[in-house]
Amino acid sequence: TEVIAVSMDNKEKALKTKSDWSIKNLNIAYGLSEDDARKWGLYISKSIKEAESDIFCEPGLFIIREDGTLYLANTSNMPWARPDLTDFPAKLIFAEENNYPVRGNY
């Protein structure tokens, strides 16, 4: 299992954020294009604060199976609607152990 965070930020800003937030055990990918963010169904926003990039994507959470199929997709148009990840690992273990099927595919 591999966890990767992906950002539309450039390398410098992504690495600064990783350092500022004390993120140690998470790979950060950067340079996601607006077009690719839209293909993933991510909402695009314009900055409202000086610290924000001019154009950026709102958060999304995706789980891709080893065979490349999408297992979970969660997107939001508001940053404060991010899912609480506290219990997320336990929920993933439950889903795997119980062979929980993909939902919302109709």
Predicted regions and their residues:
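Chalcogenol-based redox active-site neighborhoods
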Residues: 1-106
